[in-house]
Amino acid sequence: MAATFFGEVVKAPCRAGTEDEEEEEEGRRETPEDREVRLQLARKREVRLLRRQTKTSLEVSLLEKYPCSKFIIAIGNNAVAFLSSFVMNSGVWEEVGCAKLWNEWCRTTDTTHLSSTEAFCVFYHLKSNPSVFLCQCSCYVAEDQQYQWLEKVFGSCPRKNMQITILTCRHVTDYKTSESTGSLPSPFLRALKTQNFKDSACCPLLEQPNIVHDLPAAVLSYCQVWKIPAILYLCYTDVMKLDLITVEAFKPILSTRSLKGLVKNIPQSTEILKKLMTTNEIQSNIYT
């Protein structure tokens, strides 16, 4: 193409660039075999909510099937151990379902016989007050599975007359502060709540520019969008494996309205926690 006036910059056609684009286009074309592999992987990564006893899928979302006024979600081993010791041992809880999922870090293929070291995601309600729900989730829910998890649990149009409490942990090195993280009294709690959550938190609120991650962030964002009162308690710790001091760092939450009345005997619960830690140490010891 010739220039039409002096000084005009003319781009000469480049065949090499065209060939590269054609090769990229061919690479993007999906073969029937590729499509089949992709569909199989998508089916494998599908999140399913099951009745644990019958292994059949729930026809509707969990909270559409059961009315809920209070929902406590523990995500990660230390948060799960806290609920197991202080909440579940203070009342009679009935299992209503479990999540089955598969990803790079989680294989919840068999949830019938679980030990404290296995990954799982199980839902319960309190027999004396069935509108109080609890979720223990020690498995990793991948980014592409989080929306599925929310849909299966909350549904597409959730009720707003319930309160959500989320407990989880992050490593203290994820905490952004002008101070040295080595000088921080680890473990420590921070809270983040939705606009509709009006109760006071039992610890300082999470400071900017700190952010939350993974499933806890997805649940809190979902609650913010749907105007559901929700609060996330985040324990920053330097020990991410099951740890007595980290679990006990959640204790201030026992005085909040969300958990008040669910814990009857704190000294007894502390003893149960110590037994749980001892059992876990024995199971984790390769020499026993």
UniProtKB/Swiss-Prot annotation:
One of its GO terms (cellular component) is nucleus. InterPro entries: Proteasome_assmbl_chp_1. The modification Phosphoserine is found at S180. GO terms for molecular function: molecular adaptor activity; proteasome binding. GO terms for biological process: cerebellar granule cell precursor proliferation; chaperone-mediated protein complex assembly; proteasome core complex assembly. Residues 26-35 have a biased composition (Basic and acidic residues). Pfam families: PAC1. It is found in: Cytoplasm; Endoplasmic reticulum. In the adult, detected in brain, colon, leukocytes, breast and testis. Widely expressed in the fetus. Also expressed in a variety of proliferating cell lines. The keyword NAD does not apply. Keywords: Acetylation, Chaperone, Cytoplasm, Endoplasmic reticulum, Phosphoprotein. Signal peptide: none annotated. The modification Phosphothreonine is found at T18, T54. Belongs to the PSMG1 family. Chaperone protein which promotes assembly of the 20S proteasome as part of a heterodimer with PSMG2. The PSMG1-PSMG2 heterodimer binds to the PSMA5 and PSMA7 proteasome subunits, promotes assembly of the proteasome alpha subunits into the heteroheptameric alpha ring and prevents alpha ring dimerization. Forms a heterodimer with PSMG2. The PSMG1-PSMG2 heterodimer interacts directly with the PSMA5 and PSMA7 proteasome alpha subunits. This is Proteasome assembly chaperone 1. The lineage of its organism: Eukaryota, Metazoa, Chordata, Craniata, Vertebrata.
